[in-house]
Amino acid sequence: MSRKLFRNGRIFTPTDRGVPLAGKHQGDVIHIPRGAIYAKDGVIEAVGDEREVLAGISAGQVDEEIDCRGYCVIPGFVDPHTHMCFAKTREEEFLLRIEGMEYLEILGRGGGILSSVRAARAATEDELFAFTRKHVMTALGLGTTTLEIKSGYGLDTESELRMLRVIERIGRETPLDVVPTFLGAHAIPEEHVAHPDGYVDLVVHEMLPAVARHSGAVFCDVFCEAGVFSVAQSRRVLEAARGVGLELKIHTDEVHDLGGSALAAELRATSAEHLLRTSETNLRAMAEAGVVGILLPATAYSLRRRYAPARRMVELGLPVAVATDCNPGTAYTESMPFVYGLAVLGMGLSMQEALVAATLNGAYAIGQGGRVGSLEVGKSADFLLLDGKSPAILAYHIGVSPVVEVYKQANPMRQWEGITGDHP
């Protein structure tokens, strides 16, 4: 048994109401100026004002005491949308984009996702694991303690299953909690471009049953966008996914308001992601259906597009989460501190709203709200020490990470091989 007491921290944490926080509750964050956390075997047993926590335990109940030195203490980041499982970067496409070429044009030339597909298919499982682990450990050093990772660079049954095996191995062999998502409907592979409905048939009739039998995938996602998968095709995939026991996610309204957000509301998907072009009608529909909107400001920043209307989403009662969208093409970042800063400075969220978006709502967006995302009794002792007076330091101190230490299940993470971060 391991019993640890963390003292002298400025605690900021969302308050979990059992559902994603939305509307006037999006910024429900409590501040404990001198707080303490008592954890037993990695689970929080007490949290609150230091004097009150100390009054509830005896010296014999503490194996180790850690002084948080007045640092800001927040929950570990939950990154609910990543594509960290890939085999090579795409710097050459970045140069094309900054010269003005649109992403869908790059995709039409066989670049974009299709470039990553060729690389992933050619990579061995160990090569793919090593590349993925590098990015996951970078994320850990920057404060992410739970994350989702999608497949989607295989686009055939064997390659998609290989990616999911790698993602599951990442969850076993790194300290992070990893939620696998099947994204076989990420793009139409080159061999099916003349018959896209035939590829949808493959996803529905071959891939999804195989994923359900042979992988630990929790979610199924689909890229519902002009030139990729139509609303009708996306519906086929998502309904089939639900039929084999997977929860639902959808990439939609990144470039065009195609109607994927309305589909998300109709199917009561767990989340809808991107949402740069979503109509107010569909935002309201998703809010009523309890869909979490996962916003990806680093992608908008990288593509030099307008940000998703986060402020309006909060006003309409849509639960907002934020994520890195870490991928080799349009958002090559593992940094949730950077994303938090963009949420505040680019999308207009308050310090408290952005903290909820980067922690508790992200947890609910991947089915982990009961375990992580806030510092409360019964949850995993996953938290960060920040060199600042409040979480605002994440947006205020531009371009660096203020993360001093990362704790996962009350264990310090800095000793892990491969972990990186800006702070000494």
Curated annotation (Swiss-Prot):
Annotated residues for binding of Zn(2+): H81, H83, H251, D325
Single GO biological process annotation from the record: L-histidine catabolic process to glutamate and formate
Binding residues for Fe(3+): H81, H83, H251, D325
Matching SUPFAM superfamilies: Composite domain of metallo-dependent hydrolases (SSF51338), Metallo-dependent hydrolases (SSF51556)
Any Gene Ontology CC annotation: cytoplasm
Gene Ontology molecular-function annotations: imidazolonepropionase activity; iron ion binding; zinc ion binding
Keyword annotations of the record: Cytoplasm, Histidine metabolism, Hydrolase, Iron, Metal-binding, Zinc
Residues binding 4-imidazolone-5-propanoate: R90, Y153, H186, E254, T330
Broad class of the protein's primary localization: cytoplasm
Reaction catalysed by this enzyme: 4-imidazolone-5-propanoate + H2O = N-formimidoyl-L-glutamate
Binding site residues for N-formimidoyl-L-glutamate: Y153, N327, G329
One Pfam family cited in the UniProt record for this chain: Amidohydro_1
Pathway field: Amino-acid degradation; L-histidine degradation into L-glutamate; N-formimidoyl-L-glutamate from L-histidine: step 3/3
Enzyme Commission number, as recorded: 3.5.2.7
Cofactors that this protein relies on: Zn(2+); Fe(3+)
Subcellular location: Cytoplasm
Cross-referenced Gene3D superfamilies: Metal-dependent hydrolases, Urease, subunit C, domain 1
Record text on cofactor binding: Binds 1 zinc or iron ion per subunit.
Its biological purpose: Catalyzes the hydrolytic cleavage of the carbon-nitrogen bond in imidazolone-5-propanoate to yield N-formimidoyl-L-glutamate. It is the third step in the universal histidine degradation pathway.
Family: Belongs to the metallo-dependent hydrolases superfamily. HutI family.
Protein name: Imidazolonepropionase
Protein species of origin: Syntrophobacter fumaroxidans (strain DSM 10017 / MPOB)
